[in-house]
A protein has these predicted regions:
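Non-catalytic alpha/beta scaffold blocks inside enzyme catalytic domains
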Residues: 2-178
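Non-catalytic, alpha-helical, charged scaffold/linker segments
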Residues: 156-167, 182-198
C-alpha cells in the first residue's frame, strides 16, 4: 500500500516530483490509503486556494463521525499568516515571515545548480521577529530531538542542532553534501556565507 497519504510515487500517481498536495485532505477524510491521527500542514492553505473545490474541502474538514468526533481527528497548522486554514486547526504554530528566518534551497531539495557546478540558495533574515514566533524548520528540529529521532540527537541524547540555522550549517548526508554545500568554502569548513564572487 502507498507510504504517503497523497499516494505520490505509486502506480496510480507515478509522476509526483512535487507531491499531490491537493489530495491530502480528501485522502485523510476518506481514510485512503490509511487512517491518520493527525494532519500536520505547513503554509498550505488547503481550505482555500489549493483545494480546487473549496466547499467540498470545508465539508471534509468539518465532517464528524456518528460518535461526534471529527473524521480528520487532529489538525496542526503552521503559517506566518492567519489564513483560512487556521479556523480548522486544533493547534496553530505561528511561523516567521520570509524576512525573519533562515532558509535554503539546497542540493538535497530541488537542485538549482548546473551540470558542472553545485549551487545553493540561502535566505538570510533581515529583521528580527517582533512577536512570539519560531521558524517552522526550527520547530521540526526541536520535535526531532524531543522524539529522539535519528539524526536529531547526539550519542549523549542532546540536540544535534540548536535551530534551523545551525542545521543548515552543520548537517551533511555525506562529507561535503549538506543543505549549504556551496557555502562551505573551498576548504569545506566555512559556513553561512561564501567568499565574494570573482
Amino acid at each position: 500500500s502507498p507510504a504517503r497519504i497523497d499516494k505520490a510515487f505509486t502506480w496510480e500517481n507515478p509522476m509526483s516530483a512535487h507531491g499531490l498536495m491537493h489530495m491530502v485532505i480528501s485522502n485523510a477524510f476518506a481514510k485512503d490509503p490509511y487512517e491518520i491521527d493527525t494532519l500536520f500542514l505547513y503554509m498550505a492553505n488547503m481550505a482555500w486556494n489549493s483545494s480546487m473545490n473549496t466547499q467540498s474541502t470545508v465539508e471534509m474538514l468539518t465532517a464528524k463521525n456518528s460518535d461526534g468526533d471529527y473524521k480528520i481527528k487532529n489538525i496542526i497548522y503552521s503559517d506566518s499568516y492567519s489564513s483560512e486554514m487556521v479556523a480548522y486547526a486544533d493547534l496553530i504554530l505561528p511561523d516567521t515571515t520570509y524576512l525573519e528566518r533562515y532558509d535554503c534551497i539546497s542540493l538535497l531539495d530541488r537542485p538549482i545548480g548546473e551540470p558542472d557546478l553545485i549551487a545553493d540558495a540561502i535566505r538570510w533574515p533581515v529583521v528580527k521577529p517582533d512577536r512570539d514566533v519560531r521558524g517552522f524548520q526550527s520547530v521540526l528540529i526541536d520535535l526531532g530531538h524531543r522524539l529522539s529521532l535519528p539524526g536529531f540527537i547526539t550519542e549523549e541524547g542532546k540536540p544535534a542542532y540548536s535551530d534551523y540555522e545551525d542545521y543548515m550549517k552543520k548537517h551533511e548526508r555525506k562529507p561535503g553534501i549538506g543543505p549549504l554545500a556551496g557555502f562551505r568554502g573551498l576548504d569545506g569548513k566555512s559556513n553561512g556565507r561564501g567568499s565574494p564572487n570573482q
